[in-house]
Regions:
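Generic hydrophobic-segment detector
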Residues: 5, 31-32
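Short, structured beta-strand/loop micro-motifs enriched in basic residues and often containing a Trp
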Residues: 22-30
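Short aromatic-glycine-enriched beta-strand elements
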Residues: 13-21
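Generic "edge-of-domain/loop-turn" microfeature
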Residues: 13, 27, 35-37
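Short nucleic-acid-contacting surface segments enriched for D/E, G, S/T with interspersed K/R
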Residues: 33-46
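Hydrophobic beta-strand residues in large extracellular and virion-surface proteins
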Residues: 8, 20-22, 41-44
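Structural detector for short beta-strands of small beta-barrel domains
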Residues: 1-14
Length: 46
């Protein structure tokens, strides 16, 4: 972890799969904990 740093532009949930779309990097699958903690517009490090 730690190599991806950017702004969350979208959140998605597909069944039990949780995703965050990070500007300039694309879509990442994350845990439910991360998904619920992060808001659109937040800067995150993955």
């Amino acid at each position: 972890g730690g190599e991806i740093f950017g702004k969350v532009v979208e959140k998605g949930r597909h069944g039990k799969l949780y995703t965050l779309t990070i500007r300039d990097y694309g879509v990442f699958v994350v845990t439910k904990d991360v998904y619920e903690k992060v808001k659109v517009g937040d800067e995150v490090m993955l």
